[in-house]
Regions:
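Hydrophobic core segments of alpha-helical transmembrane domains in multi-pass membrane transport
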Residues: 12-25, 55, 128-134, 179-191, ...
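Transmembrane helix-bundle core of multi-pass membrane transporters
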Residues: 120-196, 222-225, 245-250, 300
Length: 324
């Protein structure tokens, strides 16, 4: 039994089963057993899960990215600005937002890899900078379909098709498109980590950076790639967030990094780097998603949910240290 508990996947599954058992016990008069509850949980956790995909790559390199929430907010505002106000085609707006997110991530990675700035400091600076960019390009206001005319009245623009698509449900309204995007991001990360040379580089850099350097691994390029991909996934999440809210809010995404980090840590990816996987992050997303949903259907307030999430992060980190 002890040997099995040494497996991160087993421990993550035990945590998920425990949370599901709580849901079955405190089922809010049967609400937990309805498919709508599970569908809505998947839709809610998908944006956080997409952020956690990028964070998983960064944390395996022994880094951290505190800017994911702000980059989500920046790209959501940029997407709304390009689509709702400038009325650009989705074929131009989507790639532009994805490139902007990836570029911001590469800047963080470059500061860390080339200038030896601590990941905490570099991404903290990017967190503040990206929030500032979101407020700057939006003028501090939400970008919605309501457009102010010179005479003081409002004109309501049509919702772009890409917004409607990202906010839709398929298969008889049973699966949200954003959930499928989350699963696609999981698949992309799995391919990177399991099938590509750069995935092995990411593990090598996180396991022992100096040994990786002496073995010929391009350490700086690997770190820039990991943070660039994190920024890319932030942009994907930003597009989904803007479509779900039908607006670009410069304040959106605040504290999202807390939930995304919790998903990665609870899944079992080691904060010290070198160990972990995207499958564990998926289990962590399900655990956090179900935990929040169970608290929600049982009318536990937001304050209680936030405090519980913080306590779970501390518990997961202490458990990792105990295992050593």
């Amino acid at each position: 039994m002890t040997i099995h508990l040494r497996s991160s996947a087993v421990r993550a599954l035990i945590a998920l089963i425990f949370v599901l058992a709580l849901g079955a016990l405190f089922n809010a008069e049967g609400a937990f057993f309805k498919w709508d509850t599970h569908r809505d949980m998947l839709r809610h956790i998908s944006v956080f899960g997409i952020l956690a995909c990028g964070l998983t790559l960064v944390i395996i390199t022994a880094g951290i990215d505190l800017s994911v929430g702000s980059l989500l907010g920046f790209t959501a505002v940029l997407f709304a600005l390009l689509s709702l106000r400038l009325e650009l085609s989705a074929w131009l707006a989507v790639p532009a937002c994805l490139a902007a997110g990836a570029l911001c991530g590469c800047v963080s990675g470059g500061l860390i890899a080339k200038f030896r700035i601590q990941p905490f400091i570099a991404t903290l600076a990017m967190m503040v900078f990206a929030r500032g960019m979101a407020k700057s390009i939006s003028g501090g206001q939400k970008i919605t379909t309501a457009i102010l005319r010179p005479d003081g009245t409002y004109h309501y623009a049509d919702v772009p098709g890409v917004f409607a698509f990202l906010n839709s449900k398929i298969l008889g309204q049973n699966i949200a498109v954003v959930t499928l995007i989350f699963l696609l991001c999981i698949l992309v990360c799995w391919i990177i980590l399991s099938r590509l040379r750069w995935g092995r580089y990411i593990y090598a850099v996180g396991g022992n950076e100096e040994a990786a350097r002496l073995s010929g691994v391009p350490v700086a390029a690997t770190k820039i790639l990991a943070y660039g991909l994190s920024g890319f996934f932030c942009a994907v999440a930003g597009l989904c967030q803007a479509a779900q809210e039908l607006q670009g809010d410069p304040e959106t995404g605040i504290s999202y990094e807390l939930t995304a980090i919790a998903i990665v840590v609870i899944g079992g990816t080691n904060l010290m780097g070198g160990r972990g996987g995207i499958g564990l992050t998926f289990i962590g997303a399900m655990t956090i998603g179900y935990l929040e949903k169970i608290l929600s259907i049982n009318a536990v307030g937001e304050a209680g949910r936030l405090m519980l999430t913080g306590a779970i992060i501390v518990g997961a980190v202490l458990f990792q240290k105990y295992r050593k």
